[in-house]
A protein has these predicted regions:
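C-terminal helical cap and adjacent loop that interface with cofactors, partners, or active-site loops
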Residues: 291-314
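Histidine-centered active-site/metal-ligand motif
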Residues: 8-10, 187, 314
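A contiguous active-site-proximal alpha/beta segment in oxidoreductase catalytic domains
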Residues: 105, 115-196
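Short helix/loop capping segments that flank catalytic or ligand/cofactor-binding pockets
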Residues: 184, 284-285
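Short, hydrophobic/proline-enriched secondary-structure or compact coil segments at domain edges
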Residues: 173-176, 273-277, 298, 304-305
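A short, structural micro-pattern
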Residues: 30, 167, 269, 299-301
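N-terminal glycine-/serine-/threonine-rich beta1-alpha1-beta2 phosphate-ribose binding loop
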Residues: 1-119, 135, 141-142, 199-208, ...
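Short, solvent-exposed loop/turn motifs
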Residues: 281-282, 313
């Protein structure tokens, strides 16, 4: 875990320590953060200041000691695993090799040694490696402890504050964000998933995934429909029009819908994923990512999503 300004640790742990605004008051969770393990401590570290101000929370040099509070057996009621930020390598695919799996194994070692387990929440996706992620799920089931994971976007504010009617017959969905291979993808995927899983019949699973980048992405953009190899352009336009952070392709007071030529100039390294669900739902994630080194690029700064029902309604 890394703990600095605007880090995931600050966003999550500070809310446990300080509380947060909820409805018409300030909510303080009815639980205590009693121990902390921080792997990399830089000049901008906040963990030491937080521990000094909240003496009930102690920092330990290892994950095992944090879980046992310096003793021999598990002594906490729940575990929060945050493997984000810090100095870790990338692989050839651009994935950030965060050690979430390795952290998880150290947690499980304490569970096994103690003869009991506790629920664990893993911030964002389980791992960059599919086999690691599957092993984490299999281990939690074999040891019978709750394992939860995911992005914060499904539970953040929505503008407007709407949702799909429960049981809605959804035909196709598109979600848009500003890129970020691996780390950024999970956010927009989960934001869309939290909405479409309310569809008629509930979640059925995904049977196929297709990724587009480079020339294949722009060909898919021009295809005009899912059946032609792309996605619904009306849904894409709806996403861009709903964005509160749509970057105008030219100086103007109001939003301007970018053309394909604008998008190529502003977001030359864009990519997309198409998901085919077992019940026939088609969904696409479009990531308008600026080219490497492009400081004035980008299209949107927020995440937006649109869906078409079987009767044609958006």
């Amino acid at each position: 875990m890394i703990y600095h300004k605007y880090s995931h640790s600050e966003h999550i742990i500070d809310r446990f320590l300080e509380g947060y605004g909820w409805e018409n008051g300030h909510h303080r969770p009815e639980m205590d953060v009693v121990s902390l393990y921080v792997e990399q401590v830089g000049e901008n570290d906040l963990s030491r200041e937080r521990a000094e101000r909240h003496p009930g929370m102690k920092i330990y040099p290892t994950i095992a000691e944090a879980l046992t509070e310096g003793g021999s057996d598990l002594s906490v009621d729940a575990v929060l695993l945050i493997g984000e930020h810090g100095s870790y390598p990338h692989n050839e695919k651009g994935q950030h090799l965060y050690p979430r799996y390795e952290y998880f194994q150290q947690v499980v070692d304490v569970y096994r040694r103690s003869g009991r387990a506790a629920p664990l929440f893993n911030d964002k996706h389980l791992s960059w490696n599919w086999d690691y992620a599957k092993e984490m799920v299999d281990t939690s089931r074999a040891m019978n402890f709750g394992l939860m994971a995911g992005s914060s976007l499904p539970v953040t504010w929505r503008q407007p504050s709407i949702d799909l009617p429960l049981g809605a017959p959804v035909k196709e969905a598109v979600a848009v964000w500003g890129g970020g291979i691996d780390g950024g993808d999970i956010h927009v995927i989960e934001a869309m998933q939290s909405i479409v899983e309310r569809r008629r019949g509930g979640e059925t699973g995904i049977v196929a995934v297709e990724a587009f980048r480079g020339d294949r992405f722009w060909k898919a953009m021009a295809a005009g429909s899912w059946d032609a190899g792309g996605w619904d352009p009306v849904l894409l336009e709806s996403c861009l029009s709903r964005s509160n952070q749509l970057k105008s392709p030219r100086p103007t007071y109001s939003h301007v819908l970018p053309t394909t030529d604008d998008l190529k100039r502003m977001a030359g390294d864009s990519y997309a994923y198409r998901f085919e669900y077992a019940d026939g739902l088609k969904a696409t994630i479009v990531q308008f990512q600026a080219a490497a080194g492009q400081t004035d690029g980008g299209v949107v700064g927020d995440c937006s999503m649109a869906a078409r029902l079987h009767d044609g309604d958006l």
